[in-house]
Amino acid sequence: RRTWCEDMLWWGPAGIGSTYTIARYAQQHSGPFRGAFSDRSKTNHICRLAEGHYGGFFGWPNFTARLSGEFMGMPATGKVGEFRVIDIYRRAGDKLAENWIFIDLLHFWKQQGVDVLTNITKDK
């Protein structure tokens, strides 16, 4: 609440979804995410940018974490995975109002032993 507008919008990647308001963000994304991962590394923002009311950062990988709990309906693997992330923000006044986040989930799941694209073609 110190940095976000109460009616903030968080536009998450496919498979995770989007949320409206700080409370819903905590319930639908940040809480489950924090509960599913341990041993999270520091972020590695290779690129930072800002223009007007917009800013963002990118990292390949942005951070690593161990899948120690259920995430996206998948069980814990105990494996460490890389997160490739693009994070773009919009500011309104002194607070953040919107966040668009792109996570290469195909890459993450492949590191966990799940090849999503191969599994999709097998189902046909």
Predicted regions and their residues:
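C-terminal and inter-domain tail/linker signature
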Residues: R1-K124
